[in-house]
Design a protein with these regions (language model features):
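Phosphate-centric recognition/catalysis
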Residues: 94
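Helix-hairpin-helix
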Residues: 271, 279-327
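Long, highly charged low-complexity segments enriched in Glu/Asp and Lys/Arg with interspersed Ser/Thr
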Residues: 325-337
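Active-site beta-strand-loop-beta-strand hairpin of nuclease catalytic cores
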Residues: 97-125
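Residue-level signal for well-ordered alpha-helical positions
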Residues: 109, 118, 193-194, 300
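Generic structural "secondary-structure junction" signal
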Residues: 84-86, 117-119, 125, 285, ...
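Surface-exposed interaction regions that form or flank ligand-binding interfaces
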Residues: 1-91, 128-282, 304, 336-337
């Protein structure tokens, strides 16, 4: 009986039948937590709110991918937010997924609107603007991005490999280390009817991610060796402990310095301008702009007269007399920061 139990334990330890999150920590989560804390301390900071919105969108995308992977019955190790460096090259990989045969480098995209990939492999984003009109814009290829990330990892492996292993890496690395671009927004329509077939197999929606991985594993060569659970864990451990860069940044302090310094410095610049303008015109400072109006200027930072008029921060007479000069001060400060 003891022999049978040991045999069962050995089989279970050899084969992995469910996903394991080996590294869950995410830079985006740390940034989000820091921004939320700062938001409760700094009121009405438009730049902070824009940064928070961008970080939140990325975090939602990352979480969606982890959620989908954890629903799978595929035995795999999931590594989230892996940053590696080779000489002057740095790669920040959203996910590395290690399966018994293939390792996947995953780039997450959580975009508003739809994505079309044309016959040349160009990524084109389409969305409806505030005027309910369709807009199209080309975007940097996320596929090139994740391929570059994989290439950094390849360079690291080549540097550490023996002469014989280097030949194997050069020949087979791309075959066993696949790249995927995963579209995380469930409302995004992905149009790849004209895309090259080589690209169609590398871009998927999040809800089809597990299906893609299963297809690859099912269609792998029949005589392909499968890595055991211990081998997969060994590789995951090596990536996280030996290769992954941990910068230990304090994002709260970083963001606090960025957003409070920006506001305070611009405030002092506009106050200096107001004082000087009032002297030049022989008027009191309130006739340039009041303290309440100053806070609105700091909040929205308009850079055109049209925007200043639209926001209704200042009355028409102040815009006519001082508007362009105020805009110039904001633009000058923005360029210098």
């Amino acid at each position: 009986m003891e022999f049978i139990n040991k045999l069962i334990d050995k089989i279970v330890s050899y084969n992995l039948t469910e996903p394991i999150v080996y590294k869950h920590e995410s830079e985006l989560q740390l940034k989000y937590d820091a921004l939320m804390k700062l938001k409760s301390e700094i009121k009405e900071n438009k730049e902070l709110e824009q940064e928070l919105l961008m970080v939140k969108k990325g975090l939602i995308g990352e979480n969606e991918i982890e959620y989908q992977l954890m629903k799978s019955d595929i035995g795999m190790y999931i590594l989230r937010d892996i940053k590696v460096k080779y000489k002057d090259l740095t790669a920040q990989i959203d996910y590395i997924v290690i399966t018994p045969i293939y390792t996947y480098f995953i780039e997450c995209k959580n975009l508003m609107g739809n994505i079309t990939i044309d016959s040349k492999g160009n990524f084109i984003r389409e969305w409806i603007n505030s005027n309910k009109q369709k807009q199209w814009i080309g975007m940097p290829s996320p596929l090139n991005q994740v391929e570059n990330q994989r290439n950094v990892m390849k360079k690291i492996k080549l540097e550490q490999a023996s002469s014989l292993d280097k030949l194997m890496i050069q020949k087979y690395f791309e075959d066993y280390n696949k790249v995927l671009v995963v579209v995380a927004n469930q409302y995004t329509i992905l149009n790849m009817t004209k895309a090259p077939k080589s690209i169609q197999s590398k871009v998927v929606r999040a809800d089809r991610l597990n299906e893609r991985i299963k297809y690859d594993l099912k269609n792998a060569p029949k005589d392909e060796n499968k890595n055991s659970k211990s081998k997969m864990e060994e590789r995951a451990k090596r990536i996280v402990e030996k290769l992954c860069i941990n910068e230990n940044k304090d994002y709260y302090l970083e963001y606090k310095e960025r957003f409070t310094q920006t506001k305070n410095t611009l405030k002092s610049e506009l106050e200096r301008f107001r004082e000087q303008r009032a002297k030049e015109k022989g008027i009191t400072t309130n006739y340039v702009f009041t303290d309440a109006e100053l806070e609105e200027l700091l909040k929205y930072k308009p850079t055109t007269i049209e925007t200043l008029i639209k926001l209704k921060i200042l009355p028409q007479i102040k815009i006519k007399c001082h508007g362009q000069e105020i805009i110039n001060e904001i633009i000058k400060y923005t360029k210098n920061t």
